[in-house]
Amino acid sequence: MNIFEEGSPFQRFLNKMTDLLVLNLVTLLMCLPVITAGAALTAMHYVLLKMVRGEEGYIVKSFFRSFKRDFRQATVLWILYVALAALMVSNLVLVLEGSGKYPLWLPSSILVVGLLALMFMIYTFAMLSRFDNSIYHTLLNAVTITFSELPRSLEMAVIVLVPLLAFVRFPVLLPFVVLFGLSVPGYGCAVVYDPIFRKIEKQIWEEENAEYPDDREDV
């Protein structure tokens, strides 16, 4: 089989990487105003889950559909996470500069809280892109799933952190970050949380059908 033949595994791989490249550039562009980053991440997860499920259509069109629809809630949630991150970073700097004044376990505790916040954030924007809910319940569900699916949550944290730490250690990787630094780790996360979302969707479907059963009789 010709590897460049339409439908070949190599051709499908190239198509997938092209979609991830386009999605990464659009997401990065919409993150530049900073305040819109939450909506951009939500839209990215919206597209990525469709890609994982083989439902992707027009990448840019799907992205901006979610971006517009979820902008308000995503922006509020993003501001909350930025405020939390700023608080943790300032506390960590304060503790590290005040060497000897604070217990040795305190810096580690702050880092653990930061890791939890990262896992909360991944679920938050991914769930916002998929489920209609209030800000409070989106956060509550993100926290609940983080702990109930802790192995998967830690797996997603690793998927996100390894490329980030690699870039910090090797700045020469900047071109990869620009081209794939958001979409590729995000795609990995979508592969991980897709089974969780499918279970939630099944539960919602069962509850809706139990509430409104088919009242037709067999004839």
Enumerate the language-model features and the residues they cover:
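Helix-coil boundary and N-terminal low-complexity module in membrane systems
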Residues: 1-110, 120-123, 127-219
